[in-house]
Design a protein with these regions (language model features):
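Extracytoplasmic/periplasmic, Sec-exported soluble proteins
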Residues: 55-59, 106, 110, 127-130, ...
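Bacterial N-terminal signal peptides
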Residues: 10-21
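The canonical Cys-X-X-Cys-His
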Residues: 63, 67-77, 87, 138-142
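Gly/Gly-Pro-rich "capping" loops immediately C-terminal to redox-active cysteine motifs
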Residues: 60, 64, 80-119, 123
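Bacterial N-terminal signal peptides that target proteins for export
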Residues: 2-12
């Protein structure tokens, strides 16, 4: 190897050794730290155990009118579907050899998932517009249509997580952090 190539190689190696130190010493200085109080309004996650459910309450009897006004145009009368997905029916359709109808009553494992989804995404044209009482009521109505809760059963942060969905045991737990 010529002296010139040795010099180039030595410069290259010095740069490779120095680069990590230079790169870690400089930061782009973008943004600013965010306080937990600023994150709280965005943290609307609700777990299967009901952690994160807001105060409020509702019944299927109260939810029927809310459903008719906010949901029926897309999910059909009594959750039958058309033009969008059915919310009701499909019991027993997850068995082998049958085409599955994945509805709230046949597929979803937790009632809190229904509340969480409606809270985040519905009604489609005006998501996040329903207050907690309306959310509990329309959730109760959909669960009532699926014969999971009674028309006058009160759903709230304490009772909603206790609702036993028909397919709760139909999923295999998968540990994400073994």
């Amino acid at each position: 190897m010529s002296t010139r190539n040795r010099f180039r190689f030595a410069c290259f190696m010095a740069a490779m050794i120095a680069f990590p130190a230079i790169a870690s010493a400089q930061s782009p200085q973008l943004g600013q730290p965010i306080a937990p109080a600023d994150i709280a309004p965005w943290d609307i996650s609700i777990g299967p155990d009901g952690a994160g459910l807001p105060p409020g309450r509702g019944t299927a009897a109260l939810g029927e009118a809310i459903y008719a006004a906010q949901c029926q145009a897309c999910h059909g009368e009594k959750g039958a579907g058309r033009p969008n997905d059915a919310l009701v029916g499909g019991k027993g359709s997850l068995a082998p050899g049958k085409p599955p109808l994945k509805t709230v009553g046949s597929y979803w494992p937790y009632a809190t998932t229904l509340f969480d989804y409606i809270r985040r995404a519905m009604p489609f044209q005006d998501s996040k517009s329903l207050d907690p009482d309306q959310l509990y009521a329309v959730s109760a109505y959909i669960l009532h249509l699926n014969e999971i809760v009674g028309k006058d059963d009160v759903l709230d942060a304490e009772t909603l997580p206790k609702v036993k969905m028909p397919n709760r045991d139909g999923f295999i737990p998968f540990p994400r952090n073994p």
